[in-house]
């Protein structure tokens, strides 16, 4: 057949290629891993070779095996609100979801190379994954059982804020955490971040909590990722729940989904808005329809189907 032509947009952002590998991984669950590897395996492998050699201008692999991104002067994560040209949430250094995605991508690449008989590259990714697994725990896991949101070794900074980005280390197919560690992270997300409309972007117990997305633009910018609830994060939360507890928590996941049902009949009918206030009554805010939110709810509905209750 003809060579596969793929255009990935905005690859200058540090995490875009990691998400591209995740998308390929999800595609394999739909069509079979064999068909996925036949079509996209070489692309996934090439992406990971590019990243693993620190060729990306904004994502570098450090000596400890983790990836590092500079975000002090320019927002580089999905929490990208700015004021006066500077990030409001200056997430920089070792960023927790980047490294959860990185570890998952390394293990998936190892799996792909094993399937196609590329022994040398399989060993390369396997060795990197082993290194990253231990470093992830050393860098992110704190004595309270949750994960630092980011750690910037340059400024000797550990961000103790309880944020939802740690849920990816539980939800993804491959995790550097043990089962007890994953359960502790999940429990903290449940207790401090879960709302009927998604996960809060910041715990009410953390400094700077601002759950109401109201007021003039500058005021809303400061609240955007400081306590507002985001439905798309609930998708990964529910996936994490099913991954940990399987069939026994299907009814719980269904109850979480019910929280979005009424939104289908208000504002823009048949869809879900961008975000919600983090405190009751959880008013809808932002764009009246948000693709990431809709996609994640639909993905969880498909995840539930395989439990056949």
Regions found by a protein language model. Name each.
Residues 270-273, 305-309:
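C-terminal non-catalytic interaction modules
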Residues 119, 126, 135, 208-240:
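Amphipathic, soluble alpha/beta structural segments
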Residues 3-17, 80, 84-100, 149-177, ...:
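Solvent-exposed loop and edge beta-strand segments that line ligand/cofactor-binding
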Residues 1-70, 96-99, 103, 228-253, ...:
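Aromatic-rich carbohydrate-recognition surfaces in CAZymes
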Residues 49-68, 103-213, 255, 262-294:
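Catalytic cores of carbohydrate-active enzymes
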Residues 34, 38, 89-92, 96, ...:
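Charge-dense, low-complexity intrinsically disordered segments
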Residues 111, 119, 226, 243, ...:
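Terminal accessory carbohydrate-recognition/targeting modules of carbohydrate-active enzymes
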């Amino acid at each position: 057949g003809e060579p596969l032509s793929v255009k990935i947009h905005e690859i200058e952002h540090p995490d875009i290629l990691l998400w591209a590998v995740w998308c390929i991984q999800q595609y394999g669950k739909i069509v079979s891993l064999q068909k996925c590897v036949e079509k996209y395996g070489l692309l996934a492998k090439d992406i990971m070779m590019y990243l693993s050699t620190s060729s990306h201008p904004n994502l570098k692999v450090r000596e400890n095996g983790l990836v590092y991104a500079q975000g002090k002067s320019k927002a580089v994560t999905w929490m990208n609100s700015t004021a006066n040209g500077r990030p409001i949430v200056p997430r920089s250094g070792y960023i927790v979801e980047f490294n959860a995605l990185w570890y998952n991508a390394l293990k998936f690449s190892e799996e792909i190379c094993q399937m196609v008989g590329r022994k040398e590259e399989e060993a390369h990714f396997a060795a990197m994954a082993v290194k990253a697994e231990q470093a992830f725990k050393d860098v992110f896991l704190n004595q309270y059982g949750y994960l630092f949101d980011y750690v910037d070794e340059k400024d000797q900074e550990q961000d103790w804020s309880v944020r939802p980005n740690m849920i990816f280390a539980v939800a993804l197919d491959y995790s550097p955490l043990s089962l007890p560690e994953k359960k502790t992270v999940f429990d903290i997300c449940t207790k401090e971040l879960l709302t009927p409309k998604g996960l809060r972007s910041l715990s009410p117990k953390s400094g700077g909590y601002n759950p109401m997305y109201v007021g003039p633009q500058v005021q809303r910018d400061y609240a955007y990722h400081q306590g507002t609830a985001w439905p798309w994060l609930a998708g990964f939360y529910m996936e994490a729940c099913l991954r940990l507890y399987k069939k026994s928590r299907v009814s719980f996941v269904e109850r979480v989904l019910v929280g979005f049902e009424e939104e289908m009949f208000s504002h823009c009918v048949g869809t879900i808005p961008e975000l919600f206030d983090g405190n009751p009554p959880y008013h809808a805010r932002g764009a009246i329809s948000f693709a990431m939110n809709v996609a994640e709810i639909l993905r969880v509905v498909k995840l539930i189907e395989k439990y056949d209750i």
